[in-house]
Amino acid sequence: MKMLVAALALLGLALWPTVGAARDATYQARADQLLSILSAPGGEDTYFSTLFLDAVPVAQWRALAADLRKQYGKPLARGAVQVESPTTGVVEIRYERATIGFTLVVAPQAPNRVVGLQLVGTRRTDDDMDRVLAGIAALPGRTALAIAQLGDAGPVWLHEQHADTLMATGSSFKLYILAELARAVAAGERRWSDVIPLSHKSFSGRLLTTPDGAPMTLHSLALAMIAESDNSAADTLLLALGRTRVDAMVATSGHARPDATLPLLTTAEAFALKMPAHADLARNYAAATPDQRRAIITANAAQLTAGAVDIGTVADIPTAIDSIEWFATPRDMVRLLDWLRRNGGDALPIMAVNPGIAPADGKRWRYLGYKGGSEPGVIAMNFLVQARDGRWFAIAASWNDSAARVDEPRFVALMTRALNLLAQ
């Protein structure tokens, strides 16, 4: 299956056409014909373009289609078609044991053959939340999850697994920065259009190579921080807004044990503390109270910058994920997402830029906002979603393993299944 996804993803990248005018009926016809092409060998020469078949010969295509049938049973019917342009859209095909989404791209010129095809989402017919939770519980290391429906009275907890367990959440902490920025804008203290210098560089991200001091709006920094998880943007915003104010948002948004994670470290400070050369400093920091930690940061500021970090010493294996981290429980993260739902304003479109899951799965929702976090031994995913009928939900989950890197695609697949089940 991994080979299939990789092959189809390659097609999606290599064979994307220039979008031109084409009749909707032509696209719908190609969408309908996808069912028969997936069902049995034959007709590939008239369905796919020469360009497609040069990249994926008929024999290879038939093997890929057969692999899908082996895993999911016979294709039964064409499901929903979500047209994005006259030549591009997402087509769902219902198999015996799953519904699979494909991005389908047709040539704008007659005979409008298919030039791009990419598998973008799978929803098993026989799936249920108990199976998803069992899959999460079976992961090595520690896992925790909370799923809630959100309303005027706050979260109503639907599914939980160690939901009050403090977990390392990686870049999920950037949602606290976003929340404080949204609060400051709503209070008239800041404007999204305010310009500040890019003043604190960190690994990694696009802005690392941007000139020091480059003028950037708060909105641009927030977008880079959330959609790209840019650490330079996060550190610049955290310190520009004021660490004290962002720390206050941790409690304001409903974190049950803020002292476990305060003060919120910049990413550069976290990288520096995780370095083997700073092991004694890290132990002192982890054992200290929040006020003592703040004093440690101030006293050792020169050692806790990106320029002092040997990134190779902390980038390959899980490092201090139980002591130098941004800690929260799944319930804490759900309450933060609910705060953003009620108070986020223009922060919500920023959260929706990167959905965190395949496009076909994300489009099951009226709104999908996402921010996750990952590093060796850590992955966290946090979703704020609105169903087609207007109901709001939040899902927050983390997987920590201090002994080994985590299997990120496996975790993403489990969370995608949970979202798809919730969307039904």
Spans of model-derived segments:
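Active-site SXXK
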Residues: A168-I196, I395
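Short solvent-exposed beta->alpha transition segments
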Residues: G42-T87
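Structured C-terminal helix/loop/strand segments within mature extracytoplasmic catalytic/sensor domains
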Residues: G121-L139, I311-Q424
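Short, glycine/proline-biased beta-turn/loop segments that scaffold the active-site neighborhood
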Residues: A187-A214
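Short, low-complexity N-terminal intrinsically disordered segments enriched in polar/charged residues
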Residues: P17-I37, D126
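Beta-lactamase-like hydrolase cores
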Residues: V120-T165
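Active-site-adjacent helix/loop patches that line small-molecule binding or acyl-intermediate pockets
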Residues: G213-T305, R331
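Exposed beta-sheet edge and beta->alpha loop/turn motif
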Residues: V83-R131, L414-A418
